[in-house]
Amino acid sequence: MTFKLFVVVTLVLAIYVATAEEAMKDDSEPAERGCIKYGDRCGSPHGLPSNCCNDWKYKGRCGCTMGVCTCGPNCPSRGCDWSKKG
């Protein structure tokens, strides 16, 4: 009985740790959780929010332009890869 309890507790801990590691990966941009990635649809034409993701690794700006998250100098929020400028 003690061995079975040990196995169950070990499995539960393993699942908990694996889930926590996934959550830590998602926290790389905590302020941008739920934001829309570059190239995805956004804005009122699609009935979606306009909050495009900021990517602090790149210079430039990113925003919702004509219903798609694109990069450009006049977009409202910082951070986009200029090589993917829309």
UniProtKB/Swiss-Prot annotation:
Cystine crosslinks: 35-53, 42-62, 52-71, 64-69
Source organism per UniProt: Loxosceles intermedia (Brown spider)
Protease among keywords: no
UniProt function note: Toxin active against S.frugiperda larvae. May act on sodium channels (Nav).
Propeptide regions on this chain: 21-33
Domain comment in the entry: The presence of a 'disulfide through disulfide knot' structurally defines this protein as a knottin.
Classification lineage: Eukaryota, Metazoa, Ecdysozoa, Arthropoda, Chelicerata
One Gene Ontology term, aspect cellular component: extracellular region
Similarity comment: Belongs to the neurotoxin 39 family.
Name under which the protein is recorded: U2-sicaritoxin-Li1a
Localisation per UniProt entry: Secreted
